[in-house]
């Protein structure tokens, strides 16, 4: 069976960035939209806690709902709709300024174009902690927003995060593909490679450690991944650069 769909991670796979610096810059830009509800320190803690709530989401609500419900907890004056409106204005007006904090991986767009030209579906399997509006802005940063991508996972169409295998089950259901038809590629040896628990082929993308810096959220994801690893056996089928990924994909033979 040949590969019919490539699922590929985004952060530190298609773009490189310093996670903690990004989070601080994000908070600085977003805080002015909610100054009438929180002081700056409280806002940052709310932001972090609500993001972690998405990472640990159990499927009972979308990740976006998990974020907002946690963010407004203990703040009766801020309701669900108003909170979402404030963040939407931020994403529409200021979020684009964070594009300068990422470095585009040079071969990413070319790889995806070649994959699409070969008739293989492409899914941007980014950890879904951003809403759709922000996620598509991030695709523009990577210069891939114009490509015919089948699906991009985001906080509004997902109820789990990586490394939970349920994230991959949901994704495969949306694109109507079996695990055997799909290849998952990304830089994280557990969060991305956990797709193998479903029977997907996996490819570990080499990370430029000098440019891509992991931070507090990745550490929390890593802790979650270690817990998941006790439930499932993960496998790495191949590894290398994005160029190596292309060669592996186009010369794939299922063992």
Regions found by a protein language model. Name each.
Residues 1-6, 113-116, 127-130, 135-255:
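Asp-based, Mg2+/Mn2+-dependent phosphohydrolase catalytic module
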Residues 1-49:
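Active-site neighborhood of HAD-like aspartate-dependent phosphohydrolases
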Residues 14-16, 53-55, 126-130, 157-158:
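Short histidine/acidic/glycine/proline-rich micro-motifs that form metal-
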Residues 19-29, 59-71, 129-130:
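Short acidic alpha-helix initiation/capping motifs at coil-to-helix transition points
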Residues 25-29, 46, 70, 110, ...:
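Alpha-helical elements of Rossmann-like donor-binding domains used by nucleotide-donor carbohydrate transfer enzymes
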Residues 37, 77-81, 145, 178:
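Short coil/loop linkers at secondary-structure junctions
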Residues 45-93:
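A metal-dependent, Asp-based hydrolase signature
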Residues 62-66, 82-85, 92-124:
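Short, acidic loop-to-helix structural element flanking the phosphoryl-transfer center
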């Amino acid at each position: 069976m040949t590969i019919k769909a490539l699922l590929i991670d985004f952060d530190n796979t298609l773009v490189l960035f310093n996670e903690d610096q990004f989070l601080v810059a994000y908070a600085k830009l977003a805080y002015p939209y909610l100054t009438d509800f929180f002081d700056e320190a409280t806002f940052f803690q709310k932001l972090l806690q609500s993001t972690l709530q998405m990472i640990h989401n159990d499927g009972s609500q979308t990740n976006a709902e998990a974020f907002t419900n946690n963010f407004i907890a203990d703040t009766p004056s801020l309701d669900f709709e108003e909170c979402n409106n404030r963040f939407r204005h931020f994403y529409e007006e200021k979020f684009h300024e964070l594009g300068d904090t990422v470095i585009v991986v040079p071969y990413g767009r070319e790889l995806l174009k070649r994959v699409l030209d070969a008739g293989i579906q492409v899914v941007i399997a980014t950890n879904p902690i951003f809403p759709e509006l922000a996620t598509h802005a991030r695709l523009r940063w990577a210069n891939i927003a114009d490509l015919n991508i089948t699906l991009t996972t985001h906080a509004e169409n997902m109820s789990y995060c990586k490394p939970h295998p349920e994230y991959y089950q949901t994704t495969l259901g949306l694109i109507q593909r079996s695990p055997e038809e799909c290849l998952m590629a990304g830089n994280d040896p557990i969060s991305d490679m956990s797709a193998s628990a479903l029977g997907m082929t996996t490819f570990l993308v080499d990370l430029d450690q000098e440019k891509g810096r992991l931070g507090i959220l990745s550490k929390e994801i890593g802790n979650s991944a270690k817990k998941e690893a006790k439930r499932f056996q993960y496998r790495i089928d191949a590894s290398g650069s994005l160029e190596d990924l292309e060669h592996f994909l186009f010369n794939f033979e299922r063992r």
